[in-house]
Amino acid sequence: MEMKQTIVCLTALAQETRLAVFRLLVEAGPDGLCAGDIGARLNVPAATLSFHLAQLANAGLLSARQQSR
C-alpha cells in the first residue's frame, strides 16, 4: 500500500464510529452485514451510518453490494 493510500485509510479509521463499523465488518467476514444490522448493533441512525459507510468506501476499506430481499 502506498503512503498516500495508507494515510487515507488511517484517517477514515481515526473516527470512532467508522472504526466500530470496520471492526464489525471484519468480524462478520466475507459475507458482511447489511446496513440495517450495523446500525442496530451500533445504535447509529441510518443517515449517520450512510455517511460513515461512504467515507469507508471512499477510502477503499469496504465495498457495497445491493441484495434483494
What are these regions (language model features)?
Residues 4, 9-48, 69:
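N-terminal helix-turn-helix DNA-binding core of bacterial DNA-binding proteins
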Residues 58-68:
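Beta-hairpin "wing" of winged helix-turn-helix
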Residues 40, 57-58:
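Alpha-helical residues within the helix-turn-helix
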Residues 53-54:
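Short, hydrophobic-biased segments on the C-terminal half of alpha helices
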